[in-house]
A protein has these predicted regions:
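Membrane-embedded alpha-helical bundles of multi-pass transporters/translocases
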Residues: 2-295, 301
Length: 302
């Protein structure tokens, strides 16, 4: 860790990693439920249960991966080995989710969906948690750390925009003929191919071009206990006993409900209620970007 100003290269490299994370999350929250329910034919109740179980597992895997990463010792540090490894299982999980075996029973399809989704959440967690921890360790200076996380947020939003434009303006309008593209299974092949490439490139670029900071990062404390589940649950219990953290979690819960509902159901509303064409849905995000800048300018004037 250093108090010196971080080079722009490091900030950009760190930030671009979140584009890969954003692409994965966009596909998961924006397409997976709709794809299994409308294309594959899995009942909505089972699809919802599968997503719910996967997200509950995610709540356990996040602190689990964080605890292991904190104690990990290697010549490549304690964050980068996870960052380098994560694209492999993430890519495999994305392919597994969108290409289940043919002629499966409803229960078999649900089981495949459940375990593939859990696999995806665990895989991207192996990047996300060490990556965020790395961002806090790149500098001792509060301002520098804030700048680093600003780059992270910008690239994260950029990932959502890239995926939205690619899917709704480039891919879906050009598939389906009389049908809208999101209801045609073949249209998802270029989407998953693009996502796998984007995720792999962004995560590896982030890991490769921040590895020169490894010698400057803090090493695991010598008095830190070896990983075990007892210490993990004690750490979780300690965090949950903090009143301020409880309030933060409550706020995040309501925010997650809002975002999850919007991302999962907006494709249904746009397709079946508003009956918008794919390209019309694609233009919605461009309007959001314009509104972001105009509202900021209006706020400055006020």
């Amino acid at each position: 860790m250093t108090k010196d100003n971080l080079p722009l290269k490091t900030k950009l490299a760190f930030g671009i990693g979140s584009t890969g994370e954003a692409a994965t999350n966009w596909v998961f929250s924006g397409l997976v439920f709709f794809y299994y329910n409308q294309i594959i034919g899995l009942p909505g109740t089972l699809t919802g249960i599968g997503v719910f179980i996967a997200m509950m597992f995610d709540a356990i895997s996040d602190p689990l991966v964080g605890s292991i990463s904190d104690r990990f010792k290697s010549k490549y540090g304690r964050r980068h080995p996870f960052m380098f490894f994560a694209p492999i299982p993430t890519s495999i999980a994305l392919i597994c989710i969108f290409y289940p075996p043919d002629a499966m029973s409803t229960f078999g399809l649900f089981t495949w969906f459940l375990f593939s989704t859990i696999f995806l959440r665990l895989s991207i967690t192996m990047f996300t948690v060490p990556h965020l921890a790395l961002g806090a360790e790149l500098s001792d200076d509060y301002i520098e750390r804030s700048k680093v996380m600003s780059f992270n947020n910008i690239f994260n939003y950029g990932g959502w925009v890239i995926m939205h434009i690619f899917v709704w303006i480039i891919i879906f309008p050009n598939y389906g003929g009389d049908k809208v593209g999101q209801l045609v299974r073949e249209s998802y092949l270029p989407i998953i191919s693009f996502t796998v490439i984007l995720v792999t490139v962004c995560i590896l670029v982030s890991a490769i071009f921040t590895r020169d900071r490894i010698p400057l990062l803090k090493k695991p404390s010598s008095d830190l206990d070896e990983f075990n589940f007892k210490n993990l649950f004690l750490d979780i219990k300690g965090a949950l006993s903090n009143k301020n953290y409880q309030n933060l979690l409550l706020g995040l819960l309501f925010l997650a409900v809002l975002i999850g509902t919007h991302e999962t159901l907006s494709i249904y509303m746009a397709t079946f209620f508003w009956e918008l064409s794919p390209i019309q849905i694609g233009y919605l995000v461009l309007n959001n970007i314009c509104l972001l800048y105009t509202s900021d300018a209006a706020d400055d004037r006020m």
